[in-house]
């Protein structure tokens, strides 16, 4: 009987620890960059992927956003366009990969971003991580580990959000 009680206590502790360890994964994600823009009137959100590997595309519609005190966004400069296009090239390559395996996926069907709307009146915030790996033959391969791109188009007052974590 004592052995049973000891095993019971151990199992309860294991269950308790399992719950405590898993709680952070259940917490609601708070997007401070999105919150910094104030309340949006409508949104569209499309995703593809699983627990760790996923791609998101979203549009947030605003009536007005004041960027004067915003700690995240900067007005786009001509010199930013290379970095923006590099990220969008990567993002769109994932959209094409998904299109090749299943063209009916919601992110494929609803991806409608048009780069021609990008100009120096718009605002951008990019948070990204790169990787570089040198192969045995000395060749280096590099790319993005993950990124969040927030692009605000001032003409339409739409925030476009691009996320990739693959």
Language-model features, listed with the residues they occupy:
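Extended hydrophobic/Leu-rich segments
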Residues: 4-7, 12, 67, 72-76, ...
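Intrinsic disorder/low-complexity detector
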Residues: 7, 55-58, 65-68, 124, ...
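Residue-level detector of functional hotspots within protein domains
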Residues: 12, 43-46, 145
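N-terminal export/targeting and maturation segments
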Residues: 20-93
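Extracytoplasmic electrostatic interaction patches
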Residues: 91-166
């Amino acid at each position: 009987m004592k052995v049973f009680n000891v095993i019971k206590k151990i199992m309860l502790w294991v269950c308790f620890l399992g719950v405590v360890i898993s709680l952070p994964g259940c917490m609601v994600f708070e997007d401070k960059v999105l919150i910094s823009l104030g309340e949006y009137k409508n949104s569209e959100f499309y995703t593809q992927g699983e627990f760790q590997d996923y791609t998101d595309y979203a549009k947030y519609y605003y009536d007005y956003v004041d960027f004067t005190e915003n700690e995240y966004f900067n007005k786009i400069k001509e010199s930013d366009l290379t970095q923006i296009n590099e990220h969008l090239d990567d993002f769109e390559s994932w959209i094409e990969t998904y299109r090749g395996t299943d063209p009916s996926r919601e992110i494929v069907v609803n991806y409608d971003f048009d780069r021609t709307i990008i100009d120096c009146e718009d605002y951008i915030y990019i948070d990204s991580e790169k990787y570089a790996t040198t192969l045995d033959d000395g060749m280096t391969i590099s790319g993005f580990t993950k990124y969040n791109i927030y692009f605000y188009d001032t003409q339409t007052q739409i925030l476009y959000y691009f996320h990739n974590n693959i």
